């Protein structure tokens, strides 16, 4: 089929994507000269939108390079990389390995693990596309979302595998709910050939002790941290054993063949991590905002965290609501297939700590007027 035919099909299905040109303005974005409250950003703590930490960092670290100019295997890794990895290792009591993005990390590490013979992946139905892309050419099965009984049935019928790697996200970015980590850890104790792979992309910085995530210091074999959301930087890190780190250094193609992160971003991520323990008030405010929006929208909304989903179940309806909200001063993009199942299409809302209660009052009023 020709490209244009495929694009025409997407348009018929109200599923055609276009890139929009915005200008960031704190908790707002400017689009077509209109100032919109931004519900699309993953800047959950408001660090990026405030700019305060960024200014403090730039005043202190003035001589960081803007380019690594090589992969880490070929000399693209100076002191900044090792210092940050050592810092993360001291926090998480395990080894740390930096990658250029969360997508690249998941794709590369899972593709590498897939080369291990007699290994099976069991992935939650709602895991991120980067995880699916990493395991799709391997032995894998999917279990019903957050359904421990369904997962255990799969385990019991596949115990002949030498290793079974269970994959989940600690906080799911579309369903806006949490993985049952404690129950998964119980399964790991029960079945000795299980390993756990947990993506903390949407929880790191904003949840857990000192914002260090929901899997912090738990018996998780592969813990994924990403820095482009609450950390307000870019890149990602794998927290794992020394053996696994050495394996990824040698087998994770996205690490071997990609230019390393810019040193200035590595240093900035390290700087933000060193401040996370100071952000308890921001995290508390974020949770209060989350609870307040649930009260305002009641049965119209799902999500127990700062990520919310207004499920509309139809691409056209989702686009309609998104456009109407934009007219009323809110940027809340529609989420459609294949990102979510057709029945789950709707409006995704990301709250951040730079918002206040009146922002949510205004949003709820606008939503009910549509």
Located regions from the model:
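N-terminal "arm"/small-domain region of PLP-dependent enzymes with the aminotransferase-like
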Residues: 2-5, 9-66, 162, 194
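PLP-dependent enzyme catalytic core of the Aspartate aminotransferase-like
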Residues: 50-51, 55-59, 63, 86, ...
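Conserved N-terminal alpha-helix of the aminotransferase class I/II PLP-enzyme fold
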Residues: 55-102, 290
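Conserved PLP-anchoring active-site segment centered on the Schiff-base-forming lysine
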Residues: 109-129, 152
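Active-site phosphate-binding strand-loop segment of PLP-dependent enzymes
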Residues: 145-198
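Active-site PLP attachment segment
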Residues: 216-247
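Structural motif of enzymes handling amino- and sulfur-group chemistry
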Residues: 260-279, 285, 289, 294
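Conserved PLP-binding catalytic core of the aspartate aminotransferase-like
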Residues: 284-329, 339, 351-353
């Amino acid at each position: 089929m020709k490209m244009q035919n495929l694009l025409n099909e997407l348009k018929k299905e109200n599923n055609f994507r276009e890139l929009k040109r915005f200008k960031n303005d704190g908790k707002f974005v400017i689009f077509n000269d209109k100032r919109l409250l931004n519900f699309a950003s993953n800047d959950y703590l408001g660090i990026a939108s405030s700019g305060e930490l960024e200014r403090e960092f730039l005043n202190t670290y003035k001589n960081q390079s803007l380019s690594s100019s090589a992969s880490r295997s070929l000399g693209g890794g100076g002191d900044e990389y090792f210092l940050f990895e050592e810092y993360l290792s001291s926090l998480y009591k395990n080894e740390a390995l930096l990658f250029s993005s969360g997508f690249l990390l998941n794709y590369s590490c899972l593709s590498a693990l897939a080369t291990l013979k007699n290994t099976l992946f069991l992935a939650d139905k709602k895991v991120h596309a980067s995880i699916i892309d990493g395991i799709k050419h391997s032995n894998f099965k999917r279990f019903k979302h957050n359904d421990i009984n369904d997962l255990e049935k799969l385990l019991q019928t596949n115990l002949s595998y030498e290793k079974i790697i269970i994959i989940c996200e600690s906080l799911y970015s579309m369903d806006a709910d949490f993985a049952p980590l404690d129950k998964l850890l119980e399964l790991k104790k029960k079945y000795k050939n299980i390993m756990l792979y947990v993506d903390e992309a949407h929880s790191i910085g904003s949840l857990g002790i000192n914002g260090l995530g929901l899997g912090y210091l738990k018996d998780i074999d592969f813990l994924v941290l990403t820095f482009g959301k609450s950390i307000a930087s870019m890149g990602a890190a794998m927290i794992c054993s020394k053996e696994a780190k050495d394996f990824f250094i040698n087998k994770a193609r996205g690490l071997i063949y990609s230019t390393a992160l810019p040193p200035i971003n590595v240093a900035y991520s390290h700087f933000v991590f060193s401040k996370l323990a100071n952000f308890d008030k921001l995290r508390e405010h974020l949770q209060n905002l989350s609870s307040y929006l649930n009260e305002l929208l009641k049965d119209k909304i799902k999500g127990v965290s700062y990520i919310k989903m207004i499920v509309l179940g139809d691409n056209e309806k989702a686009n309609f609501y998104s456009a109407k909200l934009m007219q009323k001063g809110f940027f809340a993009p529609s989420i459609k297939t294949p990102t979510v199942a057709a029945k789950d299409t709707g409006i995704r809302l990301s709250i951040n700590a730079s918002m206040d209660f009146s922002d949510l009052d205004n949003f709820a009023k606008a939503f009910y007027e549509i």
